[in-house]
Amino acid sequence: MNNYYNTKTEIAYLFGVSEGTVRNWIKRTINKELNLDLADIDGDLKIIKNTHNDSLINKLIKNGRKYRQLDLKEERKVSSKLEKLLSYNQTLTLINSIEVNKEVPLKFAYLGEGADIWNKFYLSTKKGDVYSSNNSDVFLLDKQYPIIIEHFAPNQKINVVDLGSGNGYPVTEILKKLKSENKLNSYVAIDISQKILDITKKNIEKVNLGVPIHTFIADFESQSLQDILYSIKHNEQDQNIPNLILMLGSTLPNIEPQIQPLLNIKAGMTVEDYLITSNAYDKPETRTSFPAFEFEDGKELILQIPKLLGLNNENCKTEKIYNQKKGLKEFNLVLQKDLQITFPKLNKTIKLYINDRINVWKYRRDTFELINKKCKDAELVQHFTVRNPHMNQIMYMVGIV
């Protein structure tokens, strides 16, 4: 691997500037106005990849924006719909994420009518195998059912806890099987979206399980589940009922870094509890495919919050890439002009600049090595890891001992 940036285009992409700006940096270095480290490669000056250069470039960008006049700026106020949709803390999280990470968190897309869009998206993908994670979850849970049950006492009842419940469909079959064997104590759905929980509860009630159904609003990406999971385990008779926690539908791969939600879940687990999660398996030939975007509902869901922010095809172009450096797929909005976005209720304005990349979706596929590392970092023990032989999906179950 070269220790220098191959092209000006590469630098422009990584740092969100124009190629002309990169040429100007090199020219100023030649004139001894800057002290970038350069390498002469066959007569072509290249910017070397090192911490000194990266630090200086970031400083140049920051200073340039500080004093820059936004002559071509576009001013937008966020939709009143967005201000009603998000809580005060969620709005602060959104602002911080855009300013610091240049990212619109996908989790907010499931709030409000986003829940209905998600439900439509799921139902449309269920008809085929283009977007196969949900179908694979049902298959793998059924295949691994005997192994899952072996981890619980023969006559032990179980709480099924559905994290990021979606519409509840992927867990329906395992709920039926547990009920038929008199092993199901209760079903619990946890999600950031009340509307998602309403859809889930309605669908699970149709199954007629005859057990309590509970719902909790929680953002397990940033919030410890200790209190919620403890309250589920100890019912009114103060029985210690183990939790089987399911986080399906490739929920975890949309979150970065993944260690924090794992720790938030682990905080509420005891030795009797287990977590099962799933993902697509990473192969080089799949890194340029974006199956979710083959469905209009999928694109609508992902772009819902950006549109309420004023990010649209008039001021942005879209970009689907595999980020080799980060090892994940990205869907970005690339600013075509300077933009100021105002949040009237908070009297807060954020500034975005031409060529800024705003990430609105990311996805990290798994490998056995990545799973091993996640479990090691979170101090979780793997009890099984299995791949779907028909679909490119993987599922694993972990515990705290």
Which residues fall in each region the model found?
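Polyanion-binding surface elements
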Residues: 1-25
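Short helix-start
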Residues: 31-68
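Rossmann-like AdoMet
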Residues: 65-161, 168-216, 224, 234-235, ...
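A conserved beta-strand element that flanks and buttresses the S-adenosyl-L-methionine
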Residues: 245-247
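A short, conserved alpha-helix within the catalytic core of class I
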Residues: 253-265
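Conserved beta-strand signature within the Rossmann-like core of class I S-adenosyl-L-methionine
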Residues: 269-284
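SAM-dependent methyltransferase
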Residues: 282-370
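C-terminal lobe and adjacent flexible extensions of AdoMet/dcAdoMet transferase-like proteins
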Residues: 348-401
